[in-house]
């Protein structure tokens, strides 16, 4: 409402948690366009001046998956794991289209270079929870996962990987400084 009062006729929000507020404002100020990064309400609510958008991060996730698959192949070639042991763990925030799309792209990328790769997924039901994401990663590692990736926003999973010496593919943050021995690559949105 403050931005509309200042004369803005186009308003952007950049966090999943802002969607309901943006929708409410769109209904109140029908002559202003509201664009929300992520979300689904533009499709379900059908408010003409309310829009959802998201970056094509699935493309970066596919490439990150290729890097993960290459690492798995390296581990197989060095005798660190068997082809049957090429098990990826994935810490997902929610069972939600954005997360599932990124996870699927990542897995397809990994499988494109390491056909024996499998993947187990654990959801935290939170976008950002360091302790919960770390716990999920540790559980996946204890379940035999030899590489961890994530679609959650904290450094919890990378820190677990560094502690356990397990390669990590991060999301939306660089983990090189916090996991210098295990960080492989990260997909990051550059709006």
PLM regions with names:
Residues 1-191:
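A residue-level marker of the well-folded mature domains of exported/periplasmic proteins
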């Amino acid at each position: 409402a403050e931005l509309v009062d200042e004369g803005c006729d186009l308003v952007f929000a950049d966090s999943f948690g802002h969607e309901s507020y943006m929708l409410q404002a769109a209904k109140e100020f029908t002559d202003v366009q509201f664009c929300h990064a992520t979300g689904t309400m533009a499709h379900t609510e059908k408010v003409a001046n309310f829009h959802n958008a998201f970056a094509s991060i699935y493309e970066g996730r596919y490439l990150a998956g290729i890097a993960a698959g290459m690492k798995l192949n390296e581990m197989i070639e060095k005798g660190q794991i068997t082809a049957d042991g090429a098990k990826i763990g994935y810490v997902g925030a929610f069972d939600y289209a954005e997360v599932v799309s990124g996870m699927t792209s990542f897995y397809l990328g990994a499988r494109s270079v390491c056909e024996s790769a499998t993947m187990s997924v654990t959801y935290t039901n939170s976008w950002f929870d360091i302790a919960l994401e770390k716990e999920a990663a540790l559980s996946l590692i204890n379940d035999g996962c030899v590489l961890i990736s994530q679609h959650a926003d904290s450094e919890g999973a990378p820190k677990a990987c560094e502690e356990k010496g397990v390669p990590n593919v991060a999301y939306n943050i660089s983990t090189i400084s916090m996991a210098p021995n295990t960080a492989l690559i990260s997909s990051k949105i550059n709006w």
